[in-house]
Amino acid sequence: MSSSNQVKGFYFNAQRRLSRAQALCQNSQDTLHNMQLLLVRWQRTVSKLQFTIHCICNQTVFLAECILKKTVGQQLIETEWKRMLLDELQGEMQRSQEEITGKIDALRRTKNELDGSGATLADFISMENIFLLGDKLKDVPVVQEQVEHIKVQYESLVDKVVEQLQNNRVRKLEADFAAAFRSGKNDFNAFSMKYLQKIRQLETDLADILKSLTDHYDKCSLLKAGDLPAAEQAELFEVVKNDDQELDSIMGVLEVIVRDIKSLAKNVSIRLRQKERDKQQLKNAMGKAHSELLKYEEHLTVFQGIDDLIRNFKASCLHNVSKVRELCEFYDNFLNSYQVLLREVERRRRVAKQMEDILQACEGQLMALSDTDLKQRQQFLMRHGDYLPENIWPGNIDDLSPLYDLEYRIKKV
């Protein structure tokens, strides 16, 4: 075979092998790319599963420890309801009720000394509001019974959340996730990193083979063009000739890589189908755990409703305590003012007596002065009456009536 025909044979052989290799590499590269995307997507899926399970776990702990034990148990039941309402407020109402009862008794023991009817100061006040706290105190045992009933429900709910949900369902969920994706041969991170590394290596192998075949094709094209000097042309011919003999081996390696890629894709597909079943089981378990968590959270509305009722009862009790305190203060002022009134009555009586004494003394002086005046008028008439005409001072010359007219009344106090 002539050198020219050999060059053409090298060229067409290189072109055919390169075209075949490009097609195989493209298909294999697509397979590797899809595997890579699938593994990365699964990595995100596993991370999302882990995050969601972690959220369910944290939410369960938050429900049990913060909401139920701390807020409902300690703050509401033990502090707000039992200590502040049933102990402290009840004690305050009892003290206020005893205080107002004592005030009423003091008024009942104090007789009204001003009208002589035998009435007491208690007869002058309304008894309408003195039993306000007594009625509320009767309601306290009912509230206490409700609180004890709610406490039993609370303890049952805490037990269910801690034992059934937190220690059972959620822990099993965490264990199932760890068994499916984080332990031993099922460690998905190790699995995905291992296969991603293989994918990168196979991509490199494909690229190397394709580069080698492309370089050979470029050399064949340059040799076929015949533009090189004779010595370089001869040297290139030998290189191309030797490379041409390696093409079958290179294509064999490529086909092995292609088979490895197909086998790898099959293994990944089988493994991910298994993981898909694990994922679905976990999602079902997560859904049940989340539904159970929501169910227990809905029970919190019971505590909220009871808390609203107790707060209203407490506000009503405090309002009545305030009214009773105002009444106690009013009764104190009433009793004190009555004592002051008695002193005021005595003062007025003394003033009336002083006025009576003054008027009696004045009356005596007026009578003495009037008697003296009468004698002097009589003497005047005896000496001068016969000489004065009546009409010079009509009705007065011979008038012997007193010059004063004194009438008075001292008000009886």
From Swiss-Prot:
It comes from the Eukaryota. One of its GO terms (molecular function) is SNARE binding. It is a peripheral membrane protein. Its main location: cytoplasm. GO terms for cellular component: Atg1/ULK1 kinase complex; phagophore assembly site; phagophore assembly site membrane; vacuole-isolation membrane contact site. Autophagy-specific protein that functions in response to autophagy-inducing signals as a scaffold to recruit other ATG proteins to organize pre-autophagosomal structure (PAS) formation. Modulates the timing and magnitude of the autophagy response, such as the size of the sequestering vesicles. Plays particularly a role in pexophagy and nucleophagy. Belongs to the ATG17 family. This is Autophagy-related protein 17. The gene is ATG17.
